[in-house]
Amino acid sequence: EDTEDIKSKNTEDTEKTDTADTEDADKTEDTKDKTTVASGIVCWGDDLINGEESNTYSYMTVLQKLLTDNGYNMTVINKTLQGGGTLSMMKMAGVSDETIQSYITKHQQAANGAQLNVTETGIRDLTEEQTTRNDMDCIPVIFMGYYGGWNHDPAELADQQEQILNTFQNKDQFIVVGTRPMDGSVTSE
């Protein structure tokens, strides 16, 4: 190759690199525009500690202390129900009655007339305060399933968790904590 061809080729390569860098920068700016800053963290499910000890030892209290101690200005919101099943959690999150009823019907059909735990077909009476959503722009932590409501089917539990996640504006950041059910019907074995 002669000198002119090399110069021409180098100029083309530089232009391609500059164009690629500009496109990458544009993509980064687009991503920045789409990313929303979470106003806090919201805990859904159960804290597994009852009474006064919950105020000191629940994972929400510990999480709030860790955030504060490490300089994060994020509030941890408590949307847990002591002893609440997943159906009640979905109701509290605003999942449609039709969707919740489809789970109940499925549970009743699977039971084939056998007696079910109340959390498999029952939904708690919830107060307006419990169903009011002040957490839509928060990062959800979902820790549910211990008390039932998912017919001992881990795939159904995952689907119910997703139903709650779908009620949030930003679905890019979340934590799902797994727990085995209180009755021991599903284990990791």
Where are the predicted features?
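Serine-esterase "nucleophile elbow" of acetyl-processing enzymes
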Residues: D2-T3, D13-D18, T22-G94
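Alpha-helical cap/lid subdomain in secreted, periplasmic
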Residues: K65, I100-E189
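Feature targets compositionally biased, intrinsically disordered low-complexity regions
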Residues: E12, E23, S39, G83-G84, ...
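Acidic/histidine-rich helix-loop elements
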Residues: I77-N117
